[in-house]
Design a protein with these regions (language model features):
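Bacterial N-terminal signal peptides
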Residues: 21-33
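Short, solvent-exposed loop/turn and secondary-structure capping segments
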Residues: 97-100, 150-152, 177
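Flexible, polar/low-complexity N-terminal or interdomain linker segments that lie immediately upstream
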Residues: 30-86, 90-95, 185
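Catalytic cysteine-centered active loop of the rhodanese-like fold, especially the PTP/DSP P-loop
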Residues: 122-168, 172-174
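Short polybasic linear motifs
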Residues: 1-8, 13, 19-20
């Protein structure tokens, strides 16, 4: 009889531990599942944002008719002393005077795409870019999402300049690469 009682206690303990173990395993699986779902949703939303920006950027380049240059390539061009004009399109006081790519000249453009260029801005841009329509011109702004450099490059092409590039990473990528900057005018 004692054996039966012990067996009953053993089965009772085993069942309780088994139930607890099963509960813990199921809890862990659910936690992992929820975490994986949350991660997938978060990762997916970041991927959608990246895709949206990539398509928007590609459309700007296509519409603008200009080339692209990476931050590293621009640094190489500067190191080789290639003849070019670098155009900083950020605000003079808030950005250009604080930090700009060496040799860059400044002309401010708006962030939103410009469908028209008024005569004063057109004259200022043509004066800055000069008479040589084949001159290498590189525009940049603050960072990839900024549209200022797109506007400058697009309008340089519309004005007949044929060797126009945009450095999309802007001053932010330049400084993150730990490249030298100039300050002031």
């Amino acid at each position: 009889m004692k054996c039966d009682v012990r067996r009953g206690k053993f089965l009772s303990l085993f069942t309780a531990h088994y139930s607890l173990f099963t509960f813990l395993i199921l809890g862990w699986i659910m936690t992992c599942s929820i975490s994986a779902t949350a991660y997938a949703l978060e990762w997916g939303s970041k991927e959608l944002e990246t895709e949206k920006l990539a398509v928007q950027f590609a459309n700007q380049v296509k519409k603008g008719g200009y080339g692209l240059v990476t931050t590293e390539e621009l640094k190489e061009w500067l190191d080789k002393k290639e003849p070019m004009l670098i155009v900083d399109t950020m605000p003079l006081e808030d950005s250009y005077k604080k930090n700009h790519i060496p040799t860059a000249l400044q002309i401010e453009f708006p962030v939103e795409e410009m469908s028209q260029l008024d005569e004063a801005k057109k004259a200022a841009l043509e004066e800055l870019l000069g008479p040589d329509k084949s001159r290498k011109i590189v525009s940049y702004c603050g960072f990839t999402k900024c549209g200022r450099s797109h506007n400058a490059a697009m309008w340089a092409v519309k004005l007949g300049y044929t060797n126009v590039y945009r450095q999309p990473g802007g001053i932010k990528a330049w400084m993150e690469a730990d490249y030298p900057v100039e300050k002031g005018q």
